[in-house]
A protein has these predicted regions:
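Formylglycine-dependent sulfatase
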Residues: 26-203
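Bacterial Sec-dependent N-terminal signal peptides
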Residues: 1-28
């Protein structure tokens, strides 16, 4: 057998083995989808999130107003969290979800200003006023290290303009669609545009 043919066959076998291993690994890993929905109440879908003192699911009459079969399917096949602690504003809650840390540990306890650091003269100097950064133990990075491809879609508001958290790709997402430092659209009907083009109707 000539060297060129032997080399080609060895490479083909090696590639086939690698693809087989990759396929087997992919089948062992479940897909992970996390929805973080702003201002959605525990009674705003047909999935009941209330529980009694023993942890049994309790349906509220308002749950009957909605028909959300896909959410029901996700809840039945996935994990539903019904006991948790949330901050009074979104930035600390979002940072806790991304890091798995309590707000007292990641030191984000206030809303992150989209345009600049919002620490006043009374704010603690050692506190985190700019949100997520690449040195924090964020779960998208852990997923990347485990071989996952990660994508962020929608509102991010992980950090202010100029900070690492401004771009979700800096904190572990391979792909970012729509996420930036802005925490809300320019207007409900987008008449002033979205995100960084707020106030610029021509765009």
């Amino acid at each position: 057998m000539n060297n060129k043919l032997e080399y080609t066959m060895k490479n083909t076998i090696l590639m086939a083995s690698a693809l087989a291993c990759t396929s087997a690994i992919a089948q062992d890993r479940p897909n992970i989808i996390l929805f973080l929905v702003d201002d959605m109440g525990v009674m705003d879908t047909s999935v009941p999130f209330l529980t009694d003192a023993e942890g049994n699911i309790q349906t509220h009459p308002l749950n009957q107003w909605y028909h959300t079969p896909n959410m029901e399917r996700l809840a039945s096949q996935g994990i539903r969290f019904s006991t948790f602690y949330a901050q009074s504003v979104s930035s600390p809650s979002r940072t806790s979800i991304m890091t798995g840390q309590n707000a007292a540990r990641h030191r984000t306890t206030n809303w992150i200003n989209s345009e600049s650091n919002n620490r006043t003269e009374f704010g603690p100097h050692e506190w985190n006023w700019e949100g997520l950064n690449s040195h924090m133990p964020v779960y998208p990075k852990l997923l990347q290290e485990a071989g996952y491809r990660t994508i962020h879609v929608g509102k991010a508001h992980f950090g202010c303009i100029g900070s690492e958290g401004e771009d979700p790709r800096n904190v572990g997402f391979d792909v970012n669609i729509g996420g930036n430092s802005i925490g809300q659209p320019g207007s409900y009907y987008a008449e002033w545009g979205y995100g960084l083009i707020k106030g610029n109707k021509s765009r």
